[in-house]
Amino acid sequence: MNTHLLALQLMAAQGCLGAFDTIYHHELTEALPQRATARRELAIHAVRATIYGVLFVGLSAWVWQGAWAWVLLALFGVEIFLTLWDFVVEDQTRLLPATERVTHTVLAINGGAFIALLMLGMPAATAAPTGFAYAPHGWLSVFLALCGVGVFVSGIRDAFAARALPADAAKAVRFEGPPQTVLVTGATGFIGHSLVPALLASGHRVIVLSREPRKAAWEFGGAVRAVASMAELSPQEGIDVVINLAGARILGWRWSERRKAVLRGSRAGLTEGVVEWIARAARKPRLMINASAVGYYGIQPQGSEQVLNEASPPQAIFMSQLCQEWEAVASRAREHGVPVALARFGLVFGRGGALPSMLLPFRLGFGGRMGTGQQRSSWIHIADLLGAMAHVWRLGANADGAWNFTAPEQPTQQAFAQAAAAELHRPSVVPTPAWPVRLLLGEQSALLLEGAAIAPARLLASGFSFRFPTVREALADLV
């Protein structure tokens, strides 16, 4: 029985399991790079990924002999220590979903098995002359080397995320006034992870509506009250402000009819429940801030110089219709005397969310424009978005109506690519053609390949001052 070959086969399985865990759990469902509480976990992941990268590539086609065998043993020892430390940190900072805990258990068992098999050959390896004996295993070696490259890239991503998380400009935002009770939906998302701490730091009481209330309470250190449905809130609850951020991630799965129904239900459906509670409330909230998106305005012809504002009309395409339906449901709160601020978000730039993924190709030296590069981008820094929320909060009843939460500058995608490359001191020479994006995403590709210039007309007219009005200033703060 060739125990060394069996160990490499188990390593290949480890690579597949690790890729699933990283993409599905760490990036998609748990979104670790967006969580300030995940900084230490991300740092551990970065070191572990670097070691795993060395192990996958180094063992793919070589046998480590002599002194190098002892180095290999030391690397495995460090890897085991980091894994155990990671388990402790995870349990201290977040509530792991069942699938992630099971995956980690399987990874630990499989990892122990391939390490044990490799150790069987350690006596002979340490006795051999120091060096690397070339012993390729065909496609298995190629696959292991590719796993090593992939996990190393993942480690770079985690290292940048861990380094960036501590200095969050959003922490400076304050929601002024006497202590109030605030209901926040979608609190565990990218924006909510910055909004809720800002509300708590400003002295307000926060109630979080979440499908997983125990997990939500855990994420905010027990400082919030978490409920699973509006039915858990009494009509006598006394909520002063409702901030509705709920909504399934719009960029991801193709927009099949089933997916469109999920997107509608997570926005309009949930909002309908909030409005129904407002109708029953003995004391009505003084304000409802309802998140929407600049997708309300649809898309502009590329090369258009027209700049849209809050009075511009919507379009008959799905992204616009989704926003219209969402806003229509939220606006029913006005029937019960509650002012509704419809906050149409541009693409939010922060140390979480979409920006890290957008910048990763540039960090690796493969960045460039997407499609023609002439599509306009309407965006906003996370600190300015929270500042705009605080601005609307202060206006109270005068905040009723639509607001564009976008920066004053609406660059083309080509200009964004050049700005990102300049801030990261990398080239911008590898364009992404439109056809594979359209093939992969279908109708959803319009989010990336099309755009519109949306001005924050009402924010500017009401005296709001942007901290990061240009892309270069925003990127300088975030990269």
Regions found by a protein language model. Name each.
Residues A167-Q180, A446-V479:
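C-terminal amphipathic/interface module of NAD(P)-dependent oxidoreductases
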Residues K171-T181, L395-E443, A476:
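Mid/C-terminal beta-alpha module of Rossmann-like enzyme folds, strongest
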Residues Q180-S202:
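N-terminal Rossmann NAD(P)H-binding glycine-rich loop of SDR-like oxidoreductase domains
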Residues R214-G273:
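NAD(P)H-binding glycine-rich loop region in Rossmannoid oxidoreductase-like domains
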Residues K260, E272-I317:
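Conserved Rossmann-fold NAD(P)-dependent oxidoreductase catalytic core, especially the SDR/UDP-sugar
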Residues S292, A328-R351:
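Conserved beta-loop-beta element that borders a ligand/cofactor-binding pocket
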Residues P314-M319, R344-G352, T372-A383:
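Glycine-rich "substrate-gating" loop/helix at the edge of Rossmann-like oxidoreductase active sites
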Residues S331, L359-G367, Q375-P411:
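Alpha-helical substrate-binding/gating segment
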